[in-house]
Amino acid sequence: MNTTSPAAPSSSGVSFISLLVIIVLSVALAVGLPGNSFVVWSILAKLRKRSVTALMVLHLALADLAVLLTAPFFLYSVAQGTWTFGLSSCRLFHYVCGVSMYASVLLIMTMSLDRSLAVALPFVSQKLRTKAVAWRVLAGIWVMSVLLATPVLLYRTVHLGLNNRSLTCFLKYPSERHRAFHLFFEVITGFLLPFLVVVASYCDIGRRLRARRFRRSRRTGRLVALIILAFAAFWLPYHVVNLAEGFRAAAGKALGSGPVGRRLLLARHVLITLAFLSSSVNPLLYACAGGGLLRSAGVGFIAKLLEGTGSETSSSRRKGTLAQTLRGTPASPEPDPAESLTASTNPLE
């Protein structure tokens, strides 16, 4: 991520910011670490047939876990008021956060495109939506995330803080032009383009469903809204600050210079922690989407929520029906088209 470290605030007058960072990071760890571990366990241990969507949810949870596993190091640094883990750890931990950020954003974007394709071109979606294609897409997402996050390795360094006593894991650029480029690059690739794709995909889904007058389940509509709102709520403020800093850097203004620069720097220290909080929210969204499944299936509700999802299951059902027809065996009745399309618009189906 193109950020200063959560441990960066070290001058007097920012103790409140440090306390807020500690509280938010602690909440993210307390909720996200067991929550995402539960999602991974549910998919690997409880789900016998993993659909394409289940694989994406699994990788989303793994990306979130990777971020959360770095949180204790940042918590310790904030509490101590200095970075004590050296240059290699400074670069590694922030690089892991950057890779996970891109992976999470690209996975959410891919899931929204997958749902949009399933509604717009269902037969094409069935042909493309196979495990082999899914694994290639997932591999591509991780490779792209690794590449997009590489500027973190180039610009991260450890140096003395403003008080000349504490060490800070910080972004240091050769020039303000480099800083402006990195800021704009991260805003565009890490938020703007993926967010536009997510919004466009769900707008297209809604438009097609309204045009065809299909019913939409309350659970589906609620989950779609929650995913988009959570995506925007956690990442929009951070990238707005990045955008403002990018314009300041392009104008040749140094980081933290002037009253506006100092406010933006303090705002970033808080908004960085929202990235950690965003890594803990997805299990809560699944619990909201589960509804009655949480009460009826207990700890297996994630597996029930993802069980038989995607077009792989429906394709198998159609192949079985065709075989029955060729043998002269009566086929089981097809579900109502409206119900099929309604189900296919669920991002977790």
Curated annotation (Swiss-Prot):
Membrane topology: Multi-pass membrane protein
The keyword Transmembrane helix is assigned to this record: yes
Free-text description of this protein's post-translational modifications in UniProt: Phosphorylated by GRK6 upon leukotriene B4 binding; which promotes desensitization.
Carbohydrate attachment residues: N2, N164
Pfam family, one: 7tm_1
Membrane side Cytoplasmic: residue ranges: 43-54, 114-138, 201-222, 291-349
SUPFAM superfamilies: Family A G protein-coupled receptor-like
Signal peptide per UniProt: none
Annotated keywords: Cell membrane, G-protein coupled receptor, Glycoprotein, Membrane, Phosphoprotein, Receptor, Transducer, Transmembrane, Transmembrane helix
Family statement: Belongs to the G-protein coupled receptor 1 family.
Alphabetical list of PANTHER family matching this protein: CHEMOTACTIC RECEPTOR (PTHR24225), G-PROTEIN COUPLED RECEPTORS FAMILY 1 PROFILE DOMAIN-CONTAINING PROTEIN-RELATED (PTHR24225:SF72)
Name by which UniProt lists this protein: Leukotriene B4 receptor 1
Naturally occurring in which organism (per UniProt): Bos taurus
